[in-house]
Amino acid sequence: MTQTIFMVGARGAGKTTIGKALAQALGYRFVDTDLFMQQTSQMTVAEVVESEGWDGFRLRESMALQAVTAPKTVVATGGGAVLSSENRAFMRDHGRVIYLRASAAVLAKRLAEDPEEAQRPSLTGKPIVEEILDVLASREALYQDVAHHVLDGTQTPSLVVEQILQMLTGEMVK
């Protein structure tokens, strides 16, 4: 199997951590679309949102998603990449999509422990747990819709990677 593997889920679900470990296990390249966008635009997410608004950020996110998609690549997408029906169709058409699911409580705890997440602008202006609950409520169906596989992102990264490898191996056998 050489197709792109897309990791989707909310902020803090483990897309980058698990994506890096998965890429290493497969001998694939790893790309985080948020980091790619920051490097190519020379702006942080907060700066893009401040200067171009969330619509501008989402447009850049879509362009980054398409730019990094390549064989033998694991892509950690931004949490909101699924908001675009074009992005959802693109990911399903160009690879395997894995949704890392986690509860609002787990996500809030992880985000509170990550100093980089403090730099990220709020989507709603609400406290973090409330915002996560709102975001999950609005995106859960989209994550489910786009995903070929749904996994529990609260497990250890090594266990999740092992589960993904087993699923991918099972797909090759079929």
Curated annotation (Swiss-Prot):
Binding site for ATP: G12, A13, G14, K15, T16, T17, R120, Q155
Binding site for Mg(2+): T16, D32
Keywords: Amino-acid biosynthesis, Aromatic amino acid biosynthesis, ATP-binding, Cytoplasm, Kinase, Magnesium, Metal-binding, Nucleotide-binding, Transferase
Enzyme class: transferase
Homology family: Belongs to the shikimate kinase family. AroL subfamily.
Keyword Kinase: yes
Location in the cell: Cytoplasm
SUPFAM superfamilies: P-loop containing nucleoside triphosphate hydrolases (SSF52540)
Listed Gene3D superfamilies: P-loop containing nucleotide triphosphate hydrolases
Main location per the UniProt record: cytoplasm
Protein name as it appears in the record: Shikimate kinase 2
EC numbers for this chain: 2.7.1.71
Cofactor(s) the record lists: Mg(2+)
Comment text on domains: The LID domain closes over the active site upon ATP binding.
One of the GO biological process terms: aromatic amino acid family biosynthetic process
One cellular component (GO) term of this entry: cytosol
Spans traversing the lipid bilayer: none
Pathway(s) served: Metabolic intermediate biosynthesis; chorismate biosynthesis; chorismate from D-erythrose 4-phosphate and phosphoenolpyruvate: step 5/7
Catalyzed reaction equations: shikimate + ATP = 3-phosphoshikimate + ADP + H(+)
Provenance organism: Yersinia pestis
Assembly with partners or alone: Monomer.
Positions annotated to bind substrate: D34, R58, G79, R139
Its biological purpose: Catalyzes the specific phosphorylation of the 3-hydroxyl group of shikimic acid using ATP as a cosubstrate.
Gene: aroL
Pfam families named in the record: SKI
Record note on cofactor: Binds 1 Mg(2+) ion per subunit.
